[in-house]
Amino acid sequence: MMRKGLFFLFFLCATGCWVYAQDASPDTTLNGEVKERFDDGKVKSEKNYHHGQLNGPFREYYPNGNLMSVGSYKNGQLQGAYKSYYEDGSEYFEKNYIGGQLYGTSREYYENEVPKSVENYYYDALNGFNQYYYPNGNLKMAMNFKKGKLNGISREYNEDGSLKNEINYDDDHIDGVSKEYASDGSLYAIWNYKIDQKDGPSKTFYNNGQVQWEMIFQNGNLEGPSKKYAQDGKLTLEANYKNNQFEGVVKEYQANGNLKSECSYADGKKDGECRQFRDNGKQWLEWNYKNNLKDGVAHEYAPQGYLWMEVNFKDDVKNGIMKEFYDNGALKQQWIIEDGMENGPSKSYYKSGEVMTEEVYHNGRLNGVVHLYHKSGDLAYIDTYQDGVKLSRQTSSK
């Protein structure tokens, strides 16, 4: 963005100067001073010619009579100081030419006479230290050029005067260490560049100076190990990148330092085992992924650490057998899942293993007859359900 803006400024200058320097079909009979007038007779311009070519001083005026520009030509080309003014008489710019080419220091002003730019040229090419300003007078950009190409450190500032970035250039390419700053003036990032692309180790920071993210770039892409931190310096994420995407195991950490999650990735997608943990470090959830979709057996663990639920996934949807367990590992209940909903017969069990209920589900709701048993195995109740609503209960005669 910064380089494009600079190019635009240079383009305007080059275009404006070109208009004055060119004369496609000179009238070779013109000699001496030539005056051009507005319709009301006021002088519009005063120019000097020699054998049809502009030579000597010239002046141009606004319709109100104020001076628009003043300069000099030699053999049809701008030579020496060239100044231009706004219609109210305030200075617009001052430039210097040698043989029609910009040379030396050029200055441009806003209409309130606040400096807009100070540029240095060497035969039409920006050269040396150049400065650009906001309308409030604060410095906007300070850039170093060598024969028209950016070289060395260039700095960009916010309108309030605080530093925005420092960029190192080599032969018109961003190269080496560049820095970005937050609006409060604190260092936000340190980037390494190689020929306009981020390349090598880089860091971002919180405004308290603590490292926020450590990463490595290669040819503009995130590659290799990366770490993220909280403002207090505690590790929050460990990841590996390949071509800007997660690759391998990604780990997240809780504020207390315990592992929050770890998941395997391939080509930026979850692939393989993923686990999530509770604040106390005990495992909570466990899934298997294939191409970023849950696939295979998944487990959920109770806060006490024992296996609580087991379910099968296919293409990110529950399908197959789902089981619930007691804290002693005994089966508590089992369902058949189809497209994410309970369907078909289900049984629940006492902790000691005896059958507690026999149920039937349809589209995720109890339907039909439900048998409830005593621990002894004797039938206790017979309930009737429709779409999850109990319609009746019959006490067993046994």
Q: What does each model-identified segment do?
A:
Residues M1-M2:
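N-terminal secretory signal peptides that target proteins for export/translocation
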Residues G5-A14:
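Sec-dependent N-terminal signal peptides
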Residues C17-K398:
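Glycine/tyrosine- and acidic-biased, solvent-exposed loop/turn segments at the edges of beta-strands
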